[in-house]
Amino acid sequence: MAAAAPSRVSVRAAAPGQTGGFAKIRPQVVVAAAARSAGVSGRRARSVRASLFSPKPATPKDARPAKVQEMFVYEINERDRESPAYLRLSAKQTENALGDLVPFTNKLYSGSLDKRLGISAGICILIQHVPERNGDRYEAIYSFYFGDYGHISVQGPYLTYEESYLAVTGGSGVFEGAYGQVKLNQIVFPFKIFYTFYLKGIPDLPRELLCTPVPPSPTVEPTPAAKATEPHACLNNFTN
């Protein structure tokens, strides 16, 4: 006759004085152990079901500041840096046409015209010549540099015959994470432009960058101190 398979239930040896080779296992001990095992398995199953079917946590909202901050800047071409440089790359050599490139850089002043801020630097790609408006439409990609405060980058339509709005695509320094838009007001193309920035996503701007602007007109000029970049009339480490 085949020997019976050994039981999976472990048993302990009989204590001295007990009869038989093994001690008897009390049924209630086995039942209690099985109940504990079933309880653990049940809790695990409930946890798995909860993780599978419970709603996902909501995506946290954008924590960046939503307040709109205005900043005013004048861009003035003082004809001292061979800007703009017009590169005729289109097939039409007698008039402005699609594909012409215009790299440029000009000086930046505060909206109050009493402080030198830095420079603009970028490129315009001619998209359309508009003879009935005696002007052109460009796609512009450029940056505004503000010394130790960092820079702002923008992109969008640059119209030589009327105002336009460009997107603020980012920045560095105090402008890191900035977004919003900037209104470009052509005063005298390509020599005087007035910008109104509507910035979001950043902490409060430094007081040095805030001002009450001089109303734009063809006759506006920076103060002599700002033009001479005297220490009290320019940003620290401004780009020249």
Curated annotation (Swiss-Prot):
Keyword Plastid: yes
Subcellular location: Plastid, Chloroplast
Species name: Oryza sativa subsp. japonica
Name of this chain's protein: Allene oxide cyclase, chloroplastic
Record's miscellaneous remark: 'Hebiba' means snake leaf in Japanese.
First-tier enzyme category under EC: isomerase
Disrupted-gene phenotype: In cpm2 and hebiba mutants, impaired jasmonic acid biosynthesis. Flower morphological abnormalities and early flowering. Slight increased susceptibility to incompatible strains of the blast fungus Magnaporthe grisea with higher hyphal growth and impaired phytoalexins (e.g. sakuranetin) production. However, normal sensitivity to compatible strains of M.grisea. Impaired jasmonic acid accumulation in response to wounding.
Disulfide bonds: none
PANTHER family given in the database record: ALLENE OXIDE CYCLASE 4, CHLOROPLASTIC
Domain of life: Eukaryota
Free-text tissue specificity from the UniProt record: Expressed in leaf sheath, flag leaf, first leaf and, at high levels, in panicles.
Annotated GO biological process: auxin-activated signaling pathway; circadian rhythm; defense response to fungus; developmental vegetative growth; flower development; induced systemic resistance, jasmonic acid mediated signaling pathway; jasmonic acid biosynthetic process; photoperiodism, flowering
